[in-house]
Every structure is written in C-alpha cells, then in structure tokens.
C-alpha cells in the first residue's frame, strides 16, 4: 500500500501538470476569440490584415464631407502591433486638398469618457484619390503596440475646392441601422461610431459628448 506522503506527492505533481496544461490552453484562447472568419481566411491565404470592421454582407458607399472626422470602432482582443489602415474608395475623389487628410487611431479612456490619439498617418492630400474599387493602404508614422480593448479609427477629409467627393466603401447593413446599433445598451455619451464636424486636423483627444451618431459603417482593415 502506498505511503501517505507518496500519494500526496503524486497528487501534487498531477495537479501541477493539469494547471500547466490549462494555462497553455488559456494562453492560446485569445487567438481563438477573434472569430471574423473573413479575416481568418485572408490571413490563411497570406494577407497581413489582422482585424477588420467588415462583418460580411452587402456593401454600399458613403460620401465624405469637408472638415469631418469619421470614427469607426473596433475591438482588438489581444496585444497586437498595428502598422496601418487599409480601406477601399468606391468613387475616387477629385478635389484640392487643404489642412490635414489622413487617418488616426484612437484608444478609449472609459474613466474620462474620451478618445485619445495614439497613432496617425502623415498628411496626404491624395489619400482619398486612391483608385476606385481597389484596396488602398496607409501606414502610421510609427507602428503602434496596442493591448486588448476598444479602439476607434478616424478618417479625416479636408478640401478647399471639390469636383467629386470621395466615396468610401461601407457595409450596407450597418449603414442602414447604425443610429440604432450605435447605442444599444449604452449611455447616450457612448457610441460604436460617429463623426465630429469642423475638424482641420486630428484632435489629440475627443470627448464622447462631441461625437455625433452617423450612418457610415466604414469597411476598414488593420494590418
């Protein structure tokens, strides 16, 4: 009959093995959590896209308005290095650029209910003149390491003269019901997406109360 100490020792090591196994499984769980099958297919085929706001379904277009910052939220489930943003222009813009044209990435400060700029692209007057219906990308000035959490991608358009407004490819389903889905279960100061008017540059901070709910549903890619 085994000695009591031997039994206790065996149970101890067996328990440790189970804990180690569980920790390894949990460590991989964050990779499983992000379940956008479209993105997983892109990655499996060799794309550098890590996350996307595109939920699938039909697509449409939303025309940009001068001096308007468009904000679209995305949840990032694990620590990631983001180098830039991909987007698709369905109608190429024809305009004379002024002020700032580009993209910013904002973290969310839930304590103070505000967005904080953490990365941005260089000012590029031609960014919204990308070829129509083609995938375009824009790098941040420096790749940014982000932790798990909610983030907002901001798209800013400025012009001094315009022939044709750039039209961004968007999710048609989201565009239709965004005013509703922007606020489900949330306080009025929190939105899944929206816009801020009279913006000549990317603000370093944006209060929740400054954001207006709009129907956009931007299709964006984080790589």
Where are these regions (language model features)?
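Short, surface-exposed beta-strand/loop patches at domain edges
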Residues: 156-223
């Amino acid at each position: 009959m085994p000695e009591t100490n031997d039994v206790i020792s065996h149970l101890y090591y067996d328990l440790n093995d189970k804990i180690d196994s569980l920790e390894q499984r949990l460590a991989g769980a964050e990779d499983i959590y992000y379940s956008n099958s479209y993105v997983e297919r892109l990655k499996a085929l060799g794309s550098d896209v890590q996350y996307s706001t595109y939920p699938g379904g039909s697509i449409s277009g939303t025309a940009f308005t001068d001096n308007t910052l468009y904000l679209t939220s995305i949840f990032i489930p694990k620590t990631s290095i983001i180098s830039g943003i991909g987007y698709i222009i369905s109608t190429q813009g024809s305009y004379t650029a002024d002020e700032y044209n580009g993209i910013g990435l904002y973290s969310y400060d839930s304590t103070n209910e505000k967005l904080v700029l953490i990365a941005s692209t260089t000012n590029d007057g031609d960014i919204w003149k990308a070829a129509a219906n083609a995938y375009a990308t824009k790098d941040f000035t420096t790749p940014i390491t982000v932790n798990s959490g909610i983030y907002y991608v901001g798209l800013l358009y400025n012009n001094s003269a315009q022939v044709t407004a750039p039209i961004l490819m968007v999710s048609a389903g989201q565009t239709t019901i965004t005013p509703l889905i922007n606020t489900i279960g949330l306080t009025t100061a929190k939105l899944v997406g929206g816009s801020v008017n009279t913006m000549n540059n990317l603000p370093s901070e944006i209060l929740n109360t400054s954001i207006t709910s709009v129907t956009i549903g931007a299709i964006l890619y984080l790589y």
